[in-house]
Regions:
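Conserved C-terminal alpha-helix-loop-beta "cap" of PLP-dependent enzymes
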Residues: 311-431
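Short glycine-rich or small-residue beta-strand-to-loop segments that form or flank ligand, phosphate
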Residues: 60, 64-65, 91-94, 328-333
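Flexible linker/loop signature enriched in Pro/Ser/Thr and Pro/Gly
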Residues: 84-87
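Conserved PLP-enzyme active-site core in the AAT-like
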Residues: 2-26, 30, 37, 47-53, ...
């Protein structure tokens, strides 16, 4: 079987040396992979329990249209999300188009003119800069008289508690905590660290809303931020919780008032959650959530595999190969434009869709420099499917994530290494 497998990898373009190096790394990671599988099993049981508690039935998959009144599948799914993630209520809709939309919705519905938004973990995603008004944009929070302040993490990645205390004012209404690193190389926040930060903030101002941007973090650990005091948790269905099956959508889970505010902003005052047809995608939302713990486990294995390989080749990787994992993203700093692009070409070449396409840097909306993206995905923009991207500027860091199966993630990493090896950008001869 091993010989047959190696021949199949060779057929896909993986050389004998690259394959041997990958097999060596995989053997070293067996114990860590077993721990990931154990966490996935726990989270799988959690999802099943939530579905059974809420009596999910075949009728939940019926298609609704028009206003979407009395959409049983939609309403049941939102109760499943609330129970699964530990919230009082949930908003899970195909009308929420992406993660940025979900975050903007949560912010704009729970802030009012004169309020202040605080980020105690530094700069948010580039795409949120225009939502907040850091970069001027139509309809931003700043246009509505909502101010913003941020406190950067310390150089070692720890919280600047003194700075945070001084940044909390009488009009600080909402604190946004970005769990994942985004296009940065700071540490991703564990649920435990998020809990300690929320406790600190609530001790200073108990009525402040603590919102966690949970993108890329769902099912990575055995609990979610709502379990440690968050009031609201936000994410995208074309990331972890959609399990690779949801074709669109986002969610907001948390305190009932926060979720209701978001629902009235998404639709209209007086309508809220009562309208919004599921339009035939609801079954994929259920099935994707059901598969999500297993899919996330494969993505985690791929991230650790990538970290171990590229760390051994001398590159800086964040997290490193031994650190605990709190999201599915793996950053690799290449310090070289050609190496970064070659990596992305390898990820694209391993895709089941558009494998023949060569990714090129381009001026992506929402970013201040060219971005390169590799994503031969079934769902456009899906970050739980095998993908890699990054801003093409120093330190030329590429952000790798996803893989609907561990085996596909493995192929992607080996293909990325193959591209670098063919161009003499790495030397693996002594490591095989």
């Amino acid at each position: 079987m091993n010989q047959l497998l190696e021949e199949k990898y060779k057929e896909l373009g993986i050389s004998e040396k690259v394959y041997a190096f990958g097999e060596k790394i995989e053997q070293e990671l067996k114990e860590r992979f077993e721990k990931i599988d154990a966490n996935a099993e726990y989270n799988q049981m959690k999802v099943i329990a939530a579905m059974q508690k809420n009596r999910v039935s075949a009728e939940c998959f019926n298609i609704s249209s028009g206003y979407g009144y009395n959409d049983m599948g939609r309403d049941t799914l939102e109760r499943v999300y609330a129970d699964c993630f530990g919230g009082e209520d949930a908003l899970v809709r195909p009308q929420i188009t992406c993660g940025t939309h979900a975050l903007a919705l949560a912010l704009m519905s729970n802030l009012r003119p004169g309020d202040e938004l605080l980020s105690p973990v530094g700069k948010p995603y580039d795409t949120l800069e225009e939502v907040i008004g850091i970069r001027p944009s139509k309809g931003s929070l700043a246009e509505y008289g909502i101010t913003y302040s941020q406190v950067d993490l310390r150089p070692d990645g720890s919280f600047d508690y003194d700075g945070i205390r001084n940044a909390i004012h009488e009009n600080t209404r909402l604190v946004t905590i970005q769990r994942s690193k985004g296009y940065q190389t700071r540490p991703t926040l564990s649920v435990e660290r998020i809990g300690k930060l929320i406790t600190f903030i609530k001790n200073i101002k108990p009525d402040v809303i603590c919102m966690v941007d949970n993108c890329y973090g769902e099912f990575v650990e055995d609990r979610e931020p709502l379990a440690v005091g968050a009031d609201m948790m936000v994410g995208s269905l074309i990331k972890n919780p959609g399990g690779g099956l949801a074709p669109i959508g986002g969610y907001i889970v948390g305190k009932k008032e926060c979720v209701e505010n978001a629902a009235y902003r998404l639709t209209s005052p007086g309508l809220g959650k009562e309208v919004g047809a599921s339009l035939g995608v609801i079954q994929s939302f259920y099935q994707g959530l059901f598969l999500a713990p297993t899919v996330v486990s494969g993505a985690l294995k791929g991230a650790i595999f990538a970290a171990d390989i590229y760390e051994k080749l001398g590159y800086k990787v964040v997290p490193d190969s031994t650190e605990s994992r709190h999201d599915i993203i793996q950053a690799v700093e290449f310090q070289n434009r050609d190496a970064m692009i070659a990596f992305c070409e390898g990820i694209q070449a391993a895709a089941p869709v558009d494998s023949y396409v060569t990714p090129e840097p381009w001026a992506m909306p929402g970013y201040d420099c060219d971005v390169i993206m590799a994503a031969g995905a079934f769902v456009q923009g899906s970050s739980i499917e095998l993908s890699a991207d990054g801003p093409v500027k120093p330190p030329y860091a590429v952000y790798f994530q996803g893989g609907l199966t561990w085996y596909h993630a493995k192929l992607g990493i080996l293909m990325s290494l193959q591209k670098l090896y063919e161009r003499n950008l790495v030397n693996i001869d002594e490591l095989c």
